[in-house]
Structures are given as C-alpha cells and as structure tokens.
C-alpha cells in the first residue's frame, strides 16, 4: 500500500493511494472497525504501530471504498506522509559521493540527526534564505520507515522491523556544513549544515515494505529544472538498509515511525565546488552539477517504485 497525509477543509487526513485517487481511510473504514484502528486511521505513526492489524483493515477499506471516500489525487493537497519523531541520517553511503568530497576515512556509517521541524511535503516550497546559506544543495535519499520497535537488531532480522520506504531530499547548506582549513583539510559542522526550515522534504507517500521486492535494486535520480543531476541505484550503497538498521539500533531503541535516511550518491553541486573542497568523482557516468539551487528552481527526487518528490525553491 501507499499511504499519504493530505489536507481537507484545513485538517490533516490519512489516505491511501489507489490509481489516480486518494482514499480517505476514516471515511472508508468498514463498519465495526475497532476504536483503536479508527484512531490509527487519523495518525500515520499510530497506523504504523498498529502493524498487521492496521494494514489488514486499511486494505479492506481500500477494497470497499465508495466514491464518497475518494478524492482525485490531482485535486489533493498532499502533506509530508509522516511527522517523524526522529530522523536518523547516514552520510557518505555511496562511493561516488565520497569521491566528490574532501577525503575522509570512516569505518562506520556517518551518523547525524535532522530536525523534524524542517519536514515539508510534496509540492511544498524549499526556502532559500541567504541569511542561512548561499550554497543550497540537494540530496535524493531513500528513507527507511521503522515499523517494529527494537534495540541491537541484527542485520539478518532488520526487515522484520521495516514498515516501508519513502523519499527525502536532504537539503543542505554547504557553506554551513563545510569549512576548509588553511592546509586544505576540512571541518564538518552537520548541525547548521543540515538543520533549518524546509530542510527535509519527504514524500509523496510511504510505500509499505511488501510493495518493494528488493530495496537494494532501485534506480535513484535527481533533476533540477529537468536537468539530470544524480543517477544511481540503491544497490550501490556502501551499507545496506539492513546494515543501517543494525547500526542505528546499537545507539537508540528504534520506535515505530522513526525514519532512517540512507545517504545520497554523487552528483551534488558540492562536487563541482572547489572552494569547499569538492572534486569530480572518478566514475565517468556521474553527472556534474552546474550550480547550487536558486529561487525558481524545481527539484525532482525520484526513486523507482518508491515515489517522485517535487519541490520548488523560493527566496525567503
């Protein structure tokens, strides 16, 4: 299934995509649906926590949905599919992205957090605030949505804890993230570089894990104004989805609704920015970006089978 949150009469509603329609789960809920499931049909995190029972009723609702429970997707204002309690991020998870950055040595995934205050949805505007950054960059990333709580989860059992997947643009202020020392080495400051208003577009939907046959075999692309900027496959991750679940669960108990961002491939604007230590990757098929994001740009983050996230950049 594909779950979305959308706006209706000023209120957030939870729906499921079917063809060109959004089916409102509360409106379509079968008679006699348990109160706990009805409550879950108004909150994505509660629906995730309802696990198989919630999914079973959601499927029944979708199958029986009448016209009154349906809204054409084209007439729907989508919001981010979830308001995550925690966004765990892994950087440097594709070799070609590592190659376009100042040299680093790392044996574990890069670990940083992103604020949920920066979450926006499909169709919302990314704000380029010059007081924050002059070098606003894009990063298409696949999101893992945790469905079952766990700590110290072995990679071999990680998929038991994954509810589904989505798309995130890890919007980054490069001139806040990276400072070059006089000797040419770099200092990373991921706090201000990764956390500001509208820094985390997510969506358009959460796709349940049963819809994705192999999360390590999905084409990933980024377009800016129709120009291809990133092109890779999730199969080129250094650490797989299962390994990232194992890694992050070492530190915190993963709860339903927590999301893990799996990193971005090469092709960022940073890779063409010598002032910040950027360098072209050795792979000849990596796209070289022409510039950082500017007001008026349209950014498309696309992962096959997971979704196509579109946002426009505006000036503050």
Which residue stretches match the model-derived regions?
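Active-site glycine-rich loop that binds ribose-phosphate moieties when present
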Residues: 119-132, 145-153
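Residue-level recognition of short, solvent-exposed, well-ordered loop/turn junctions
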Residues: 83, 89, 139, 254-255, ...
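Structural signature of FAD isoalloxazine-binding scaffolds in flavoprotein oxidoreductases
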Residues: 103-122, 138, 295-305
């Amino acid at each position: 299934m594909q779950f979305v949150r959308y706006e209706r009469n000023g209120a957030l509603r939870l729906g499921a995509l079917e063809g060109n329609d959004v089916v409102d789960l509360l409106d379509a809920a079968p008679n006699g649906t348990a109160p706990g499931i009805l409550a879950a049909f108004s909150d994505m995190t509660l629906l995730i926590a309802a696990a198989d029972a919630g999914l079973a009723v959601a499927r029944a609702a979708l199958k029986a949905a009448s016209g009154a429970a349906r809204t054409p997707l084209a007439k729907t204002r989508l919001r981010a599919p979830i308001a995550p309690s925690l966004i765990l991020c892994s950087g440097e998870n594709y070799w070609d992205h590592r190659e376009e950055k100042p040299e680093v040595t790392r044996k574990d995934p890069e670990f940083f957090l992103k604020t949920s205050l920066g979450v926006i949805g499909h169709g919302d505007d990314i704000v380029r605030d010059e007081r924050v950054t002059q070098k606003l960059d894009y990063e298409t990333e696949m999101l893992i949505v945790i469905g079952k709580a766990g700590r110290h989860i072995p990679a071999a059992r990680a998929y038991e804890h994954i509810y589904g997947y989505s798309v995130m643009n890890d919007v980054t202020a490069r001139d806040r993230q990276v400072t070059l020392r006089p000797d040419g080495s770099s200092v990373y400051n991921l706090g201000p570089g990764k956390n500001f208003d509208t820094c985390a577009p997510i969506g358009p939907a959460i796709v349940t894990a049963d819809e994705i046959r192999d999360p390590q075999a999905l084409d990933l692309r980024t377009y800016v104004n129709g120009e291809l900027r990133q092109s890779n496959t999730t199969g080129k991750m250094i650490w797989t989805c299962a390994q990232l679940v194992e890694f992050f669960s070492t530190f915190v108990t993963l709860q339903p609704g927590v999301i893990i961002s799996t990193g971005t491939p090469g092709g960022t604007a940073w890779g063409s920015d010598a002032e910040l230590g950027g360098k072209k990757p050795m792979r000849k098929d990596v796209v070289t970006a022409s510039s950082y994001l500017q007001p008026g740009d349209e950014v498309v983050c696309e992962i096959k089978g997971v979704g196509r996230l579109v946002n426009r950049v505006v000036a503050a």
